[in-house]
Amino acid sequence: MKTIFLICLLINVNDVKGSAFSFSTAFGTLHDPHLPSKCYGGDLSESLKSGVNDIVIVKQSDDAFKSTPFQARVGKLSNWKTLFKSREGKLAKLYVNNIRALPDVNLVLSDSGSVFIHRPRSIASCLFTNDEMQNMALDGERNDGLLVVADLNIELKFQIFVFNQNDRLVVTDIDGTITTSDVGGFLGGSIGVGVEQPRVVEFFDKVDFNGYKVLYLTARPMAFDGLTREYLFETLQDVDGNPPDFFRYSLPKGPLFMSPISAEKAISADAEIMKLSTLTSIINLFDLKEGVIYGAYGNKNSDTESYLKSGIKGDNVYLINEQSNIVNVATGNITSYKVQSQMINEYYPKL
């Protein structure tokens, strides 16, 4: 592994010679005045692994579309082609529901592997325009997205969700909130070990059944999007229920938002800043911002802070502790996923 990292560093140094970028640190913080600084949390450093976030589109009162940023990274260590070839300037193709989308729009990789939208006579961006989204083959609420970089043998799968102004959202962290611990949950979930909180799948299944859109927000870097999607949307599907009904439950297949910064930076990054930025980008898609997020679940103070600072009322914010007790941030009332599942119509009245 050490040899591979050495090769990567040598290649990156050569790649940036004579370009607009500058190479400044061990992994390289690449600076280009033509790239927007906020698209990836201000991080344009080297991407070692590939990953992509889902997109949420919200239909506006005038029928226009607005969306969260398009965030995708192609990592240097993804395969032999990415290892030995420069990624700078490579073109990507976008497919929506298996149909080529936006053939006249250039999706271009930066030298560090981040994907940007390039338009004539315009600065690079990570936001699609209304016209571009209207011309995607969107069909219903949940749509299959695929980013293909043919020159590098890269395919990244994600989802595009289309919501309406009257939709109400429930946000949840993953590690320590859906799983029983941060590290143990991540490691166990990545190999399919049963590490989920008691009755958590049943609870979110019922939240979804009552008409709320469940969003997953995690400080995990996008480099782990494949493992995370597999755990949430494959492992935690059709899970055995509990007596007396023994119904089977599944986690709702909602939008997944992970840290857009590189895996190396994500280790030491402030999770509160990332989550607050993501929450704000989602809430700002709605005309009436107050009450858009009807419930928010986490297990750390940073989760609570990001929820409250985004404008979510304390009455709707819940913190789960190591004993799987759920504490309401405003009232201090203690419940559990089991209790909230049994009283689902009181906590989340049907929409």
Annotate each PLM feature.
Residues 1-18:
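Classical Sec-dependent N-terminal signal peptides that target proteins to the secretory pathway
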Residues 96-97, 165, 174, 322:
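Short, ordered coil/turn segments that flank beta-strands lining enzyme active or ligand-binding pockets
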Residues 15-159, 253:
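Intrinsically disordered, serine/threonine/proline
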Residues 177-178, 217-219:
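Ser/Thr-glycine-rich phosphate-binding loops at phosphate-binding pockets of nucleotides
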Residues 19-22, 93, 100, 183-198, ...:
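C-terminal cap/substrate-recognition subdomain and adjoining C-terminal extension
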Residues 168-184, 307:
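Asp-based phosphoryl-transfer active-site loop
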Residues 159-165:
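Short beta-strand edge segments in extracellular beta-sheet folds
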Residues 142, 156-158, 202-210, 223:
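Core catalytic machinery and nucleic-acid-binding channels of phosphodiester-processing enzymes
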